[in-house]
Amino acid sequence: MSATEYAIGRHCGVTFAGLKIASLVSLRKGEEDVIQTLSRRFAGKGFAFILLREDEERLLVYICHRARLTKYLFSPDVRAFLARFGYEYGSAEEALEQLKCRMKGEFPHEIGVFLGYPLGDVCGFLRDPDGCILCGAWKVYENVSEAARTFERFRRCSACICRHMDRGGRSRRYLMWFEKHSSPDTMSPLRAPRSLTSI
């Protein structure tokens, strides 16, 4: 199994499973063909693969479910929040292009919104990076119980995928399952196969 397959399975499975709006994964330079292949395969299922940043050695790839991201970005509170950072957009694609431009400078902490993090927690981090109540997939400042349950779902999904890959399986098996069962308008978590849930 290639390092790219493992990284995608480990870091992005929760997004393909519908548990998360989007994920980031760092890949070695030279894996552009893999990204393009997956992007074509999943475009009809509502997923987008976007190269946010690259340097001499690494690629930072953003993978999202377009419909879910669009719904979140166009919620009034999120749109007003992003406007504070200069975002003006008529589509999720336009917002992502602006994020990509901002990635050329200091790391933009509003990226949490693009990953589907609760707005209250994104704002909390900007106010007080060290004042979180709980730390998991993101730093939590409110609704701790709900966040803890979400983190546990993420953990179970990722752990099962990684266990399968560590035993010699291929992440492609899960990608093929996600591809088959995803739909462009999927707005809720998918029912994963037994091997993804029997932990």
Task: Place the predicted regions along the sequence by residue.
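A glycine-rich, hydrophobic loop/mini-helix early in the fold
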Residues: 35-91
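Long, compositionally biased
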Residues: 137-187, 193
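Internal catalytic-core helix/loop-beta-alpha segment
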Residues: 84-109
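Short, surface-exposed beta-edge/turn micro-motifs
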Residues: 20-22, 57-59, 108-110
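A structured, charge-rich N-terminal accessory region that forms the first stable segment of a protein
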Residues: 1-55
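Gram-positive cell-envelope targeting signals
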Residues: 192-199
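Short acidic alpha-helix initiation/capping motifs at coil-to-helix transition points
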Residues: 73-74, 99-106, 129-132
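Hydrophobic/aromatic-rich, well-ordered segments within soluble, folded domains that form packed cores
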Residues: 108-134
